[in-house]
């Protein structure tokens, strides 16, 4: 392993852009620093705990996929597979508290860690990085993460690699905007609702693509609402932000029910009706976390707790 220190790779929250990013919608992602993971070795020669063994095997399966000529020939930055294989033989695993199936980027963090550690030409990623480099890195991360989900935008591993909020625009350009509506005297609180069940990204993405192909709902409307919310957020227009966010929430409730667990639908509808809070998908949905927005999180927290849900404030 290249680095002696155990570098952390954080979970992420995709604030906006889930599904619409598939057809060039804008996206904003932020790190979720309560959860992270890092590459590690067992204290003894063999991995002793079950989770470490499972992680080691998971990375080994990923290694087999990535090292196949069909995949590795498409890399912009070649991976040192010999070094990775040696470290796997020594029991290397990814020690993580990022919940799986929660839309928090658990597989993205693994991909980011492997890319950071084992790419021969590890590009320096910072706010001054050449835009073309961001594009190449994101493309490769998407290809690497496709092992887990069948397809990937590359946003999850890129977020974990960067460890800071960023925006992806319709031309796939990366920028690092301020998010003024989430700080200051006039603001909106963002919180996560734990549905208590795991989601499965792959079948949900397939279902979504099938609906688009059948024109079961208006994909351009979904993208338009998403982009309007993003622009209102960036321009600190709370009136437009609340309005378009409410429309986006209603669109998802009416058209994307497989992504919304039945247990949370009544609270979702209550938010649509009352305006006291607004819920939307967090990542692919189907379980895991859902995203909530409110003028004051502490005023609505008890409603979710009474209904049996745990809530989390991103940090």
What role is predicted for each listed range?
Residues 105-107, 282-287:
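Glycine-rich beta-strand-to-loop/alpha-helix junction loops that act as flexible
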Residues 109-121:
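Stable alpha-helical structural segments in soluble proteins, enriched in small hydrophobic residues
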């Amino acid at each position: 392993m290249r680095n002696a220190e155990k570098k952390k790779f954080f979970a992420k929250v995709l604030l906006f852009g889930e599904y619409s990013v598939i057809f060039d919608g804008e996206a904003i992602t932020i790190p979720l620093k309560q959860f992270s993971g890092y590459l590690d070795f067992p204290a003894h020669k063999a991995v002793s705990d079950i989770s470490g063994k499972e992680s080691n095997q998971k990375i080994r399966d990923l290694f087999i996929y990535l090292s196949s000529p069909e995949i590795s020939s498409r890399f912009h930055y070649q991976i040192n597979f010999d070094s990775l294989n040696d470290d796997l033989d020594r029991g290397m695993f990814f020690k993580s508290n990022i919940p799986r199936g929660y839309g928090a980027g658990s597989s993205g963090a693994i991909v980011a860690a492997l890319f950071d550690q084992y790419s021969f030409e590890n590009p320096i990623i910072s706010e001054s990085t050449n835009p073309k480099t961001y594009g190449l890195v994101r493309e490769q991360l998407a290809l690497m993460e496709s092992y887990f989900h069948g397809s990937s935008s590359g946003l999850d591993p890129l977020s974990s690699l960067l460890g800071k909020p960023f925006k992806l625009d319709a031309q796939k350009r990366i920028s690092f905007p301020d998010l003024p509506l989430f700080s200051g005297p006039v603001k909106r609180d963002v919180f996560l609702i734990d549905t208590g069940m795991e989601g499965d990204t792959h079948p949900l993405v397939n279902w979504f693509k099938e609906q688009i192909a059948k024109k079961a709902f208006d994909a351009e409307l979904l993208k338009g609402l998403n982009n309007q919310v993003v622009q209102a957020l960036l321009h600190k227009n709370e009136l437009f932000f609340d309005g378009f966010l409410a429309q986006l929430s209603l669109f998802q409730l009416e058209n994307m029910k497989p992504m919304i667990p039945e247990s949370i639908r009544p609270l979702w509808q209550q938010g649509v009706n009352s305006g006291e809070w607004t819920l939307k998908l967090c990542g692919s949905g189907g379980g895991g976390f859902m995203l909530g927005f409110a003028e004051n999180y502490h005023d609505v927290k008890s409603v979710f707790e009474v209904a049996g849900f745990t809530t989390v404030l991103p940090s």
